[in-house]
Structures are given as structure tokens and as C-alpha cells.
Amino acid sequence: MRPNNRAINQPRPIKITRHYTKHAEGSVLVEFGDTKVLCTATVDESVPRFLKGQGQGWVTAEYGMLPRSTHSRMQREAAKGKQGGRTMEIQRLIARSLRAMVDLEALGERSVTLDCDVIQADGGTRTASITGACVALIDAVNGLVDNGTLTVSPLKGLVAAISVGIVDGTPVCDLEYVEDSAAETDMNVVMMEDGRMIEVQGTAEGEPFSHEELLTLLNLAKQGCKRIFEAQRAALAD
């Protein structure tokens, strides 16, 4: 029996609140059950040094967790003086995922930075970050079109991400913390709206998984992402 009696292919309740803060060009509070992430998009009229004069833009991301986003207080990474390996891995994943939805040449020589700050963690923070940051990025880019900075939108479509895994021998979708901590296999899947995969990260924490189980997990991810795309579209239509 899953927490809250969810079906194996059923994500947690998804809530996407746009324009959550007033200063950023795009801001979203995304909620997957008890996991809550604030995603903001900032537009800069410059690009990193390695892209100067190349005629294309850049999309990057930063990720962090507030000290009491978890059961016990975490020390701020700023207090430690450096980012942890997990943080760097996650923000690179977020950035790669979001670059897949943007024509960087059409964006022009400007950058969009997505800041993803976890305010409450109950599993799936990186996938929630990608899902929310996608909507924040769309709002920021649409703002460039609306104010005449861009004449053509560089957006290619929606991006969503979800966790899947095997818990007590059963493949399931959108793991919360109690499931994630007990999973024999843990996987994160990032997809485009048209069904193409951007990234698949999978690890057997215990018993190795079979090819058939891999296909089952990918199918669960596809079903879960379909519901996420619906939630994103509904939020953007509001």
C-alpha cells in the first residue's frame, strides 16, 4: 500500500502557482504533495564569456534547500563556503533540461537564470524544480516577446520531470521521501512534451533491475509526465 493509497502510476497532487513573487521575470511555486519549490527566472542582457559574439543565448540554473526544508536543520552551504556535489549535480541537470526547450540562437545574446529554492522537501525536489522552472522560464521568455525584445518565441515546448522507482518489488511513480529512502531502484526521467527523453538517471540501490523493469519504469514516467504537462498547461492558461 502506497502512502495516501496512491495507484502505482499516480503522481502526488500537483499545484503550480504563477507570479508568486513580484520582482522576477518569471516566478512559480510548484508543489508535489508536501514537496514545495520556489522557482524564479531572471533575464540578463549578456551571456557567459565563452558565448560572447556567438549569436546565441544561454539558460542556466541554481538549486538550493532552505535549512528547515528537511526534518532536521541543514547547515546553509554558504556557511560551509562551498556547494556540495549533490547541489552541483542537480543544478546542472535542471539547466540541461531547460536548455532542451529553448532555441538558444532565437533567444539572442542574453541569459536566463533559473533559481530553484526548496522550501519543503518530501522527495522529488529535483524533478519538481524542473517542472516549476519550466513554467517560470516560459513566463520570462513570453515577457520578452510581449515587450518587443524578441519578435519570435524561442520556446520549443514544455519540459516535465518525475521520479520513478521500485519499492518493495513494485514499480511506482513520483516517490515521496518514505518511498525514496526504501527504494531498491531510483530513477529520474525528464521528458519533452512530444514524448522524447531529455535525461534518464537510474540507479539500483539494492538488487539490480531487469530490462523489463526498466521499460515498466519508463512507461510509468511517461504516464506521470502526461499529468504534469496537463498541470503546466492549466497553470499557463490561468
Curated annotation (Swiss-Prot):
Phosphate binds at residues 86, 124-126. Keywords: Nucleotidyltransferase, RNA-binding, rRNA processing, Transferase, tRNA processing, tRNA-binding. CDD domains: RNase_PH_bact. GO terms for biological process: rRNA catabolic process; rRNA processing; tRNA processing. PROSITE patterns: RIBONUCLEASE_PH. Phosphorolytic 3'-5' exoribonuclease that plays an important role in tRNA 3'-end maturation. Removes nucleotide residues following the 3'-CCA terminus of tRNAs; can also add nucleotides to the ends of RNA molecules by using nucleoside diphosphates as substrates, but this may not be physiologically important. Probably plays a role in initiation of 16S rRNA degradation (leading to ribosome degradation) during starvation. Homohexameric ring arranged as a trimer of dimers. This is Ribonuclease PH. It comes from Actinobacillus succinogenes (strain ATCC 55618 / DSM 22257 / CCUG 43843 / 130Z). The gene is rph.
